[in-house]
Curated annotation (Swiss-Prot):
Segments on the Intravirion face: 23-45
Subcellular compartments: Virion membrane; Host cytoplasm
Family indicated by similarity: Belongs to the chordopoxvirinae A9 family.
Membrane association type: Single-pass membrane protein
Positions in the Virion surface compartment: 67-83
Keywords: Glycoprotein, Host cytoplasm, Late protein, Membrane, Signal, Transmembrane, Transmembrane helix, Virion
One Gene Ontology term, aspect cellular component: host cell cytoplasm
Protein name listed in UniProt: Virion membrane protein OPG135
Pfam families: Pox_A9 (PF04835)
Superkingdom of the organism of origin: Viruses
Residues spanning the membrane: 46-66
Length: 100
């Protein structure tokens, strides 16, 4: 993998992470708005519900990022094995044609 590809992938990953972080913040603000209407903002249950909601949102984000990275790794492994098979096929064709 070239240096440029690695840099582009890392910048792309960071950008996606920022988008996901913004989505989590937006969901948290909506959730807090509705919770503040039902619960007092400084009550124990409000804090517990807020902490659990944050943990669930970050858990979903983590699982999604792991899934995306595994799919990318599988795609790269398949591409590498296909290119190795192509190289073997070309070398066997070249060796067969040189014997004639």
């Amino acid at each position: 993998m070239s240096c440029y590809t690695a840099i582009l992938k890392s910048v792309g990953g960071l950008a996606l992470f920022q988008v996901a972080n913004g989505a989590i913040d937006l969901c948290r603000h909506f959730f807090m708005y509705f919770c503040e209407q039902k619960l007092r903002p400084n009550s124990f249950w409000f804090v517990v519900v807020r902490a659990i909601a944050s943990m669930i949102m970050y858990l979903v984000l983590g699982i999604a990022l792991l899934y995306i990275s595994e799919q990318d790794d599988k795609k790269n492994t398949n591409n590498d094995s296909n290119s190795n098979n192509d190289k073997r096929n070309v070398s066997s064709i070249n060796s067969n044609s040189s014997h004639k």
